[in-house]
Amino acid sequence: MEKIFLLHAAARSGKNTCADAMKDYYVNSYHKRVLIIAFADYVKFVLDKYYNTPAERTEEYRTRIQQFATEQVRASDVNYWANVVSDLLVAIQEDWDIVIIPDWRFGNERVALISRFHEYGIPVKTMLIDRPNIEEVDGMTEEQRAHSSERNLDNYQNFDYTIINETSQMQKTIQQLVDLIDEEENN
């Protein structure tokens, strides 16, 4: 594994679209093996498998995810989801060159991953996806928008990179950013 990217953005700002575009560009232009893995993958798996709550895009499901992942599990172990993902990544690190985590929501997740992967010499880079003029997110209540999982990084200032998601230019912006990152690492 060469590097890990943590992507952060407001809901519906293009985190998954950005992750997919980064993956496509790394695969097609740099011939890298790229894994997209989300902290929420495990949350959704546990809810589906053990709580009989299958994933769906509803107000009730989003509330359930927020309550379960944050108030229940993180309250017990603030690094639980970061540790689950990092444990798997350590075990499979030889299989992937680039890892993209498109749902970074809490500062401690970054700290936990940096701490874990420092010993392997694998950098963890942060990326903000900023979507100007984003409209109110359909399907989210005021409480969901105010939830700590949506607001925790609002005042975070130390992103390694920022992508302005003006949808029509996003692919080009990502390509330029990936090229810049590659150039920085090779100089």
Language-model-derived ranges and their functions:
Residues C18:
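Hydrophobic positions on the alpha1 helix immediately C-terminal to the Walker A/P-loop
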Residues A38-V99, R105:
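ATP-dependent small-molecule kinase phosphotransfer cores
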Residues A10:
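P-loop (Walker A) phosphate-binding loop of NTP-binding proteins
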Residues D24-L35:
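Post-Walker A helix-loop "phosphate-sensing" segment adjacent to the P-loop in P-loop NTPases
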Residues K15:
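Conserved lysine of the Walker
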Residues V85-E143:
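ATP-dependent NMP and nucleoside kinases share a basic, alpha-helical "lid"
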